[in-house]
C-alpha cells in the first residue's frame, strides 16, 4: 500500500515537473544579454568609419510638472534621427517611433538609483577592505562575508572620504537596531542579484512613471562615512566620523504639514526630468548618429506660491527618511544648506537635535531651489538659472528696453548732467522729459539746500510746486508714479531724486528751486524705438557746448541763442509752461551714447525751397502785435512781432516778398509790471526735540513776493489774505522703552561652592514689544547675572572638559584640560592634597594630513577697553590656508562654511567704586568784565546710584570765574554781511541757522553781543 502510494506520488511529481518546464521555460542566452550588446549584435557592420550626421526630430510634448506649486520643472525632448531615415520616406521626426521595433523608445533616460547599484554592498567609503574587517551593515546584525569584494560601479554611486574637521567634529554613537532594515539583509541582496538580470530590460517601462513619492518608494539612507584613523578593537562600525555641524546651528523642527498632495491622489512629487520616456534611442547600429544642438530643454511651471502652512520641498524630502533607521536608531531629519555650491543639489539632511548631517540622496527632486533665497533651481542634480523666458539655462535677461533677451537696440538712453551756474533764487528748468519716457532717474549729485520740482506741460504742479515743499513719497503724474526721495539730513550725503518706471503720457519739465550753488543734477531716461530723439537742449546751454556727451550744432546765431537762454533761464511753476520748440528755433538733437548707438542721418530732410519771387516795393515790414508776456505779474518782458504786408491793402504776405535786411530788430518791452500777490514761503520742519515720546518741531514761514524775477521777503500783513501755516507741530520719532525683568533667577550653576545664576532682562516698549537694548537707558539696566554660594565642597580633583580643538590643525597633536585640587569655597590646594591618582591633562589627537586645509585664525585678545567695570576686548580673525610650512591669507568667503570665532568679547575688571561725576560747564554769565559758570557734581557708585563714599578732598569745583577781559568789541574783518537785507534776518530770528549766521555775520554777531551783555547785566 505504501509502495503503491509512493509510486503514484512519483508519477505525479514527474508530470508536474514536466508541465512546469513548458509553462516556465528557462531564459535564453539572448534574454540575459545587456541591451548594448544586443544592439551591437543585431546591427550590420558599418563601413563608414565615423559618426553619421543626423537630423533632429520635432519636439515632443512637455512632461508633467515636477511640483504642484512654488515653481516646478517640465522637460521636453526631441529625437536624433538618421538622415537616411527622412530620405527613405520614413515617418516624420517627432512621430511615434516605429523605425526600431525591437527597442524601447524613451523620452528621457530612466531614473538612476539614488544610493547604490544592484551589486553594490553598503561598504563604508574611504575604508580599505583589508583594514575594514567584518563590516556591520546598517540596520542588520549579519556581518559581511569576508570574500565579498566591494565595488564602486560608477562615480555617482560612491562617496568620497570627508576628513574630520571639515564640517566639525564628533562621533555618531553606534546603537543596536531598533528595527531590522530589510533593505540591507543578505536575503534581500541575493534577491536583487537574481532579479538584476531582468531589471535593465524592464527599466524603461518602469521609469515611465517618474519618481515615486516618498510614501511609495522607501527611502534609503546614504552610506556612513568612516575615517582612516586605523583599526579599532571590537566592531568597526561602532563609531564613524560623519558630517559635523557648528555649535551654533539651529536645531528647530520643521512644520508638520506637507507641501504635496497625498501619494494616493497625486504623483507630482517627483515627476520631472525622469518622469517621461525617451522619444528615440540610438539606432541598433555600431555607427553613432550625431546631431548638433540641444537634446532636451527645461521650462519653469506652476509658479503659484504654495500655502504658507506648507513645508518646503527640501523639508518634505528629508522628512521622508524619518521612518528609516540610521545606524540603529530613528532620527527626525531637516534640510542642511551650509554646503558648497557644487553640492547644493544634493539632499543633505541634518538630524534634529544632533550636530551631524547625512547626504541622503545625490540629487534632489527636479524643481527644488538651489538656495533658500536664490532663484536658481536643481535639475538632474545640477543648479540651473532661470531665464526671463522661464527656460532653464537660457541665460536670457531683460535688457534696459524691457525686452526679454533683447540686445539693447530697441530703445535709446538719454542722459546728462545739469551743471549750469545759477545766480538768482527761484525755479530753473533742468530738463524736459518727453512723452513715452521710461526708467526715469533725476538725482542731485550730492546733498544741498536746493529742491527738485516737477510740472506737467499742461501747467499742473506734481512735486514741489507753487513755492510749497512736499514731503518725500510717491506722486502720480504724467501717467506714471514718481518716487520722491530726500535722504536723511544727518546720515546721508546723497541729494534729492525723482524715480519712475514710466512710460509717461505727456511731456514733463524738471525744475530746480535754486537756493545755493548748484551741485549738479544727473538725469537719465529711456526712449523706446530706434528713431527716438533727445529733449530740447536746456536754455542754459550755450551753442557749441557738448550736450549729453555729444557736440550739438544749433541752427541759430550765438547772440540769438544767448538772448533766448537769458529769457528762458528763470521760470515760475505757477504760470504757463513755456514752449520748448518755437517756429524759429525748432530743432532735434539725437543723443546716443558711445559704443551703443551710431548716429544716423534723418530720413525726413526737407528739400530745398523754391526760388522766391523777385522782391518789389509793394511790400514792407509792419508790426502786427506783440508776443505774450513772459510772466503774469512781477515785471515780465515781451517783443514786437513784425510781418511782411502789402503797402496798400495791408494784407499779410510771405516774408520772402519783403527785404530781410530791412526787417526791424525786435526790442524787449516791459509788461505786467505790477507786483505778484504775496505768498507764504514754508521751510522744512526742524528735527524733533525728543528722540522718543512726544516732542516739538518748528519750521520757518515767511511772507514773500516776486518782482522782477526776484523773490523778496515782505511784511507779514501783505499775506493776511492767506491763512498762515503752522510754525510748530508735535512729533514722535519712536515710543520710549523701559527695562523689564522677564524671568526669576535660575538655579546656581554649581552644586557646591560659588557659582552664578542668571535671569532674563529685556528692553520692552510701552506696547510690550521686545526691542534692542540701545532703546533703553543702559545705566538703569538691572543685573542679569550674579554670584551664588552653595556651601563648601569636598576635597577632590576637579576637571574641565577636553578642549574641542586639537593643538595641531592637521597632523598629530594633543587636546588638553585643566586639573585642579579644590576644597571649601573653591579654594585651591597643593596638587598632592588630593592623592597621587591625578587625572591626565593631555590626550593625543590627529586631524589628518596637512593638505592645504582652510581654517579661521584668531589672534590674541587686546586689553580691556576700560580700567574698571565692564568693557570689551577685540582680536583679529582671518581666513588662512595652511600649506607645508606656510600660511596663506584667503578671502573670508573661503571659510564661510566654518564657524567663525568671535572677534569681540566682554571683559570685567575690578569694580570702580564710588567716583565723582560732573556735568559740562554752563555758559558764562557775562561775555566780558568777569562772569561765572557752574556745573553739577554728584558722587555715584558702580550701579549709578547716589553715594556718600567719595573723598571730599577730590570733589571737583562747582563754580568758577570766566571772561575776565574788558568789554572791547573785537572786529573781525572776515565777519561781514553778504546781503543788504540782513536786518530782516535778524528780525526774523534766523541767526540760529548756520547759513544765515554766515551770510549775515556782522548783524548776527551784534545781536549776540547785545543779548550776552543784557544777560550779564542782570
From Swiss-Prot:
UniProt domain TSP type-1: residue ranges: 53-307, 676-737, 739-792, 793-851, 852-911, 912-968
Subcellular location: Secreted, Extracellular space, Extracellular matrix
Polar residues composition-biased segments: 259-279
Signal peptide bounds: 1-25
Compositionally biased region (Basic residues): 187-200
One GO cellular component term noted in the UniProt record for this chain: extracellular exosome
Keywords noted in UniProt: Aortic aneurysm, Extracellular matrix, Hydrolase, Repeat, Secreted, Signal
GO-annotated biological processes: elastic fiber assembly; microfibril assembly
Subunit structure: Interacts with FBN1. May interact with TGFB1.
Function of the protein: Promotes FBN1 matrix assembly. Attenuates TGFB signaling, possibly by accelerating the sequestration of large latent complexes of TGFB or active TGFB by FBN1 microfibril assembly, thereby negatively regulating the expression of TGFB regulatory targets, such as POSTN.
Name of protein: Thrombospondin type-1 domain-containing protein 4
Species, as recorded: Homo sapiens (Human)
Gene: THSD4
Amino acid at each position: 500500500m505504501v509502495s503503491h502510494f509512493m509510486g503514484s506520488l512519483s508519477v505525479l511529481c514527474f508530470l508536474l515537473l514536466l508541465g512546469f518546464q513548458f509553462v516556465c521555460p528557462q531564459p535564453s542566452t539572448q534574454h540575459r544579454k545587456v541591451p548594448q550588446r544586443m544592439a551591437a549584435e543585431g546591427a550590420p557592420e558599418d563601413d563608414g568609419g565615423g559618426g553619421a550626421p543626423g537630423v533632429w526630430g520635432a519636439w515632443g510634448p512637455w512632461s508633467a510638472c515636477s511640483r504642484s506649486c512654488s515653481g516646478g520643472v517640465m522637460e521636453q525632448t526631441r529625437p536624433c534621427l538618421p538622415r537616411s531615415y527622412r530620405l527613405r520616406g520614413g515617418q516624420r521626426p517627432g512621430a511615434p517611433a516605429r523605425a526600431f521595433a525591437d527597442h524601447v523608445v524613451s523620452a528621457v533616460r530612466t531614473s538612476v538609483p539614488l544610493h547604490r547599484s544592484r551589486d553594490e554592498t553598503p561598504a563604508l567609503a574611504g575604508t580599505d577592505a583589508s583594514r575594514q574587517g567584518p563590516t556591520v551593515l546598517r540596520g542588520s546584525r549579519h556581518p559581511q562575508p569576508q570574500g565579498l569584494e566591494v565595488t564602486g560601479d560608477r562615480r555617482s554611486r560612491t562617496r568620497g572620504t570627508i576628513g574630520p574637521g571639515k564640517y566639525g567634529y564628533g562621533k555618531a554613537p553606534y546603537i543596536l537596531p531598533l528595527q531590522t532594515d530589510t533593505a540591507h539583509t543578505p536575503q534581500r541582496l541575493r534577491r536583487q542579484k537574481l532579479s538584476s538580470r531582468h531589471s535593465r530590460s524592464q527599466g524603461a517601462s518602469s521609469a515611465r512613471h517618474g519618481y515615486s513619492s516618498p510614501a511609495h518608494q522607501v527611502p534609503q539612507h546614504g552610506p556612513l562615512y568612516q575615517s582612516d584613523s586605523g583599526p579599532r578593537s571590537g566592531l568597526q562600525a561602532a563609531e564613524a566620523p560623519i558630517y559635523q555641524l557648528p555649535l551654533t546651528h539651529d536645531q528647530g523642527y520643521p512644520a508638520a504639514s506637507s507641501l504635496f498632495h497625498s501619494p494616493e491622489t497625486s504623483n507630482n512629487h517627483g515627476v520631472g526630468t525622469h518622469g517621461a520616456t525617451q522619444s528615440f534611442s540610438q539606432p541598433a547600429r555600431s555607427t553613432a548618429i550625431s546631431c548638433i544642438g540641444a537634446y532636451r530643454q527645461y521650462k519653469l511651471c506652476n509658479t503659484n506660491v504654495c500655502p504658507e502652512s506648507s513645508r518646503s520641498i527640501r523639508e518634505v524630502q528629508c522628512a521622508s527618511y524619518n521612518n528609516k533607521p540610521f545606524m540603529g536608531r530613528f532620527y527626525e531629519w531637516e534640510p542642511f544648506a551650509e554646503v558648497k555650491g557644487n553640492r547644493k543639489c544634493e539632499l543633505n539632511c541634518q538630524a534634529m537635535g544632533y550636530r551631524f548631517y547625512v547626504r541622503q540622496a545625490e540629487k534632489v527632486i527636479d524643481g527644488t531651489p538651489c538656495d533658500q533665497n536664490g532663484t536658481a533651481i536643481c535639475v538632474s542634480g545640477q543648479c540651473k538659472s532661470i531665464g526671463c523666458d522661464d527656460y532653464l539655462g537660457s541665460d536670457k535677461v531683460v535688457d534696459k528696453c524691457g525686452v526679454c533677451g533683447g540686445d539693447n537696440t530697441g530703445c535709446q538712453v538719454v542722459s546728462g548732467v545739469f551743471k549750469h551756474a545759477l545766480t538768482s533764487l527761484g525755479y530753473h528748468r533742468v530738463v524736459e522729459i518727453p512723452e513715452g519716457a521710461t526708467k526715469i532717474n533725476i538725482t542731485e549729485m550730492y546733498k544741498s539746500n536746493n529742491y527738485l520740482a516737477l510740472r506737467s506741460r499742461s501747467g499742473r504742479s506734481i512735486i514741489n510746486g507753487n513755492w510749497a515743499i512736499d514731503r518725500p513719497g510717491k506722486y502720480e503724474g504724467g501717467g506714471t508714479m514718481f518716487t520722491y526721495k530726500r535722504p536723511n539730513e544727518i546720515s546721508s550725503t546723497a541729494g534729492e531724486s525723482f524715480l519712475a518706471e514710466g512710460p509717461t503720457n505727456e511731456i514733463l519739465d524738471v525744475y530746480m528751486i535754486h537756493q545755493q550753488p548748484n551741485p549738479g543734477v544727473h538725469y537719465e531716461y529711456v526712449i523706446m524705438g530706434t528713431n527716438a530723439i533727445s529733449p530740447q537742449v536746456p536754455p542754459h546751454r550755450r551753442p557749441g557746448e557738448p550736450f549729453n556727451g555729444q557736440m550739438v550744432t544749433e541752427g541759430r546765431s550765438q547772440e540769438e541763442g544767448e538772448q533766448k537762454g537769458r529769457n528762458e533761464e528763470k521760470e515760475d511753476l505757477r504760470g504757463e509752461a513755456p514752449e520748448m520748440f518755437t517756429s524759429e528755433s525748432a530743432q532735434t538733437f539725437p543723443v546716443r551714447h558711445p559704443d551703443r548707438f551710431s548716429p544716423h542721418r534723418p530720413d525726413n530732410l526737407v528739400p530745398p525751397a523754391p526760388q522766391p519771387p523777385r522782391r518789389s516795393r509793394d511790400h514792407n515790414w509792419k508790426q502786427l502785435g506783440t508776443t505774450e508776456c513772459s510772466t503774469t505779474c512781477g515785471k515780465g518782458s515781451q517783443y514786437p512781432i513784425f510781418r511782411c504786408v502789402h503797402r496798400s491793402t495791408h494784407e499779410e504776405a510771405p516774408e520772402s516778398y519783403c527785404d530781410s535786411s530791412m526787417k526791424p530788430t525786435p526790442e524787449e518791452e516791459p509788461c505786467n509790471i505790477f507786483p505778484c500777490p504775496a505768498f507764504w514761503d514754508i521751510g522744512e520742519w526742524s528735527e524733533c526735540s525728543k528722540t522718543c515720546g512726544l516732542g516739538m518741531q518748528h519750521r520757518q514761514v515767511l511772507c514773500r513776493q516776486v518782482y522782477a524775477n526776484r523773490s523778496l521777503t515782505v511784511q507779514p500783513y501783505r499775506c493776511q489774505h492767506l491763512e498762515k501755516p503752522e510754525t510748530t507741530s508735535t512729533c514722535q520719532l519712536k515710543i520710549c522703552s523701559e527695562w523689564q525683568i522677564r524671568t526669576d533667577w535660575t538655579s546656581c550653576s554649581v552644586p557646591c561652592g560659588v557659582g552664578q545664576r542668571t535671569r532674563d532682562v529685556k528692553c520692552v516698549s510701552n506696547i510690550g514689544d521686545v526691542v534692542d537694548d540701545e532703546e533703553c537707558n543702559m545705566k538703569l539696566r538691572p543685573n542679569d547675572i550674579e554670584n551664588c554660594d552653595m556651601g563648601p565642597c569636598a576635597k577632590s580633583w576637579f576637571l574641565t572638559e577636553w578642549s574641542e580643538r586639537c593643538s595641531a590643525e592637521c597632523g598629530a597633536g594633543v587636546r588638553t584640560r585643566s586639573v585642579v585640587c579644590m576644597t571649601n569655597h573653591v579654594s585651591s590646594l597643593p596638587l598632592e592634597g588630593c592623592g597621587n591618582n591625578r587625572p591626565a591633562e593631555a590626550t593625543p589627537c590627529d586631524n589628518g594630513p596637512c593638505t592645504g586645509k582652510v581654517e579661521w585664525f584668531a589672534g590674541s585678545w587686546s586689553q580691556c577697553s576700560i580700567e574698571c567695570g565692564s568693557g570689551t576686548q577685540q582680536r583679529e580673525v582671518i581666513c588662512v590656508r595652511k600649506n607645508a610650512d606656510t600660511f596663506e591669507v584667503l578671502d573670508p568667503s573661503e571659510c564661510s562654511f566654518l564657524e567663525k570665532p568671535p572677534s569681540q568679547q566682554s571683559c570685567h575688571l575690578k569694580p570702580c567704586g564710588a567716583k565723582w561725576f560732573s556735568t559740562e560747564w554752563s555758559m558764562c554769565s557775562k561775555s566780558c568784565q568777569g562772569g561765572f559758570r557752574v556745573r553739577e557734581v554728584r558722587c555715584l557708585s558702580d550701579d549709578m546710584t547716589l553715594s556718600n563714599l567719595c573723598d571730599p578732598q577730590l570733589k571737583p569745583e562747582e563754580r568758577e570765574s570766566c571772561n575776565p577781559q574788558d568789554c572791547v568789541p573785537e572786529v573781525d574783518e572776515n565777519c561781514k554781511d553778504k546781503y543788504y537785507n540782513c536786518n530782516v534776518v535778524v528780525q526774523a530770528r534766523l541767526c540760529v541757522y548756520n547759513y544765515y549766521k554766515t551770510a549775515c555775520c556782522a548783524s548776527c554777531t551784534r545781536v549776540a553781543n547785545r543779548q550776552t551783555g543784557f544777560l550779564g547785566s542782570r
